[in-house]
């Protein structure tokens, strides 16, 4: 749709990697690899010169501590200019959609002409955290000034401290996941399931028309 300055934004093409269950066919593939595969394939299918891309934006719900900015990593592919900006964002389940929206806004505002935006997730590659108590003990040991003090810190470790902690899905403040919050909002605003399905169908049909 056109912005206030008359610039019209279009989604030219899109690609997606296969969906598989965590720990199966793609268990050795990281989220950043999936994002790079998709970006390269997009350029290949559209014959787009990567040098024409002005910005890269990617959404990710559970980023890896080893790859904190997945958008930046995608932008470092040799196909893209070295000087383009790139960043990542998190809006829970809507992270990829938010990345696309952010790209739209950049084009409308005249800050870019071509943007690659999307999202990537690999549940086989999510960070598994240590317990807070174990983390505190490890920090204490790292600051110890002698071997004896370091060993003394390690003696505080208990078996329960070694139990891994998976990333939280629910918000710590509300105890609700994004899906639960959405259901709650729909109920409070009297949005029937049929209306939601009708809207989804309308969007799907519009998307198909745009591709014809």
Functional labels for PLM-detected ranges:
Residues 11:
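Mature N-terminal segment immediately following signal peptide/propeptide cleavage
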Residues 14-19:
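Short polar catalytic/cofactor-binding loops
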Residues 52-59:
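Short glycine-rich phosphate-binding loop at a beta-alpha junction
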Residues 60-66:
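Glycine-rich phosphate-binding loops at beta-strand->alpha-helix junctions
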Residues 1-7, 21-52, 67-68, 75-211:
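Acyl-thioester C-C bond-transforming condensing/cleaving domain
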């Amino acid at each position: 749709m056109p912005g206030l300055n008359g610039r019209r934004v279009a989604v030219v093409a899109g690609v997606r990697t296969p969906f598989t269950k965590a720990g199966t066919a793609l268990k050795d593939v990281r989220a950043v690899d999936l994002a790079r595969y998709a970006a390269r394939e997009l350029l290949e299918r559209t014959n787009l010169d990567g040098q024409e891309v002005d910005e890269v934006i990617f959404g990710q719900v559970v980023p890896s501590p080893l790859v904190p900015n997945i958008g930046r990593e995608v932008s470092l592919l040799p196909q893209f200019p070295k000087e383009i900006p790139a960043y990542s964002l998190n809006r829970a389940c809507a992270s990829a959609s938010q990345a696309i929206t952010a790209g739209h806004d950049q084009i409308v505002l005249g800050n870019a002409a071509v943007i690659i935006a999307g999202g990537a997730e690999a549940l086989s590659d999510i960070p598994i955290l240590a317990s807070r108590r174990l983390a505190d003990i490890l920090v204490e040991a790292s600051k110890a000034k002698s071997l004896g003090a370091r060993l003394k810190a390690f003696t505080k470790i208990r078996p329960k401290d070694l139990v891994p902690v998976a990333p939280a899905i629910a918000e710590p403040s509300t105890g609700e996941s994004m899906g639960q919050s959405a259901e709650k909002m729909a109920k409070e605003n009297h949005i029937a399931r049929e209306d939601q399905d009708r809207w989804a169908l309308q969007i799907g049909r519009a998307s198909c028309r745009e591709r014809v």
